[in-house]
Regions:
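Vicinal oxygen chelate
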Residues: 1-11, 32-123, 133-143
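Conserved beta-strand-loop-alpha-helix junction that forms the acyl-donor binding cleft
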Residues: 13-18
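Alpha-helical macromolecular-interaction surfaces
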Residues: 20-21, 86
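Conserved active-site tyrosine of GNAT-family acetyltransferases
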Residues: 22-27, 91, 127
């Protein structure tokens, strides 16, 4: 594997309040741990081509304002999965409520086509909004 295959060009790093609780959540929805560090508590996770970093909040962290729940207000992270219903079932096993049940959405990508995805939205233990998507393909826009 080459270095460019190891690291995505953009990898979000999320401050979390309890790394172990976050790891339990992210593993349950399908992420794998690439590596961990203990000081400060940190983990690098992958799911298919998606990558994310988690770091337990600490006094030396890069925090520009007080962290208040829900964390990450104003953003959602889209993560492609093979099957949204499988992800939904994994969330049920944790007893978590979803933010939005699976539904199909179509987005215009050109003047003639739109691409669809089945979407499931859920908040992680710190409130970050995650949008798990299953691609549905492309279709012509009817006029």
């Amino acid at each position: 594997m080459t270095e460019s295959e190891l690291w995505s060009a953009l990898v979000p790093e999320l401050s979390v309040t309890d790394l172990e609780a976050s790891l339990n959540f992210y593993r349950t929805v399908g992420f794998q741990v690439r590596f961990v560090r203990t000081s400060p508590p940190f983990a690098y996770l992958t799911l298919g081509d998606a990558q994310i970093m988690l770091e337990q909040a600490h006094s030396e962290g890069w925090v520009v304002a007080p962290l208040e729940r829900p964390f990450g207000r104003g953003i959602n992270l889209q993560i492609e999965v093979d099957n949204v219903q499988s992800t939904r079932a994994a969330l049920t096993s944790l007893g978590l409520q979803v933010f939005r049940e699976p539904s199909d959405s179509w987005y215009q990508v050109s003047g003639a086509y739109e691409e669809g995805q089945r979407e499931l939205l859920v908040q992680d233990p710190d409130g970050y909004l995650l949008r798990f998507v299953q691609p549905l393909g492309r279709r012509s826009i009817e006029r």
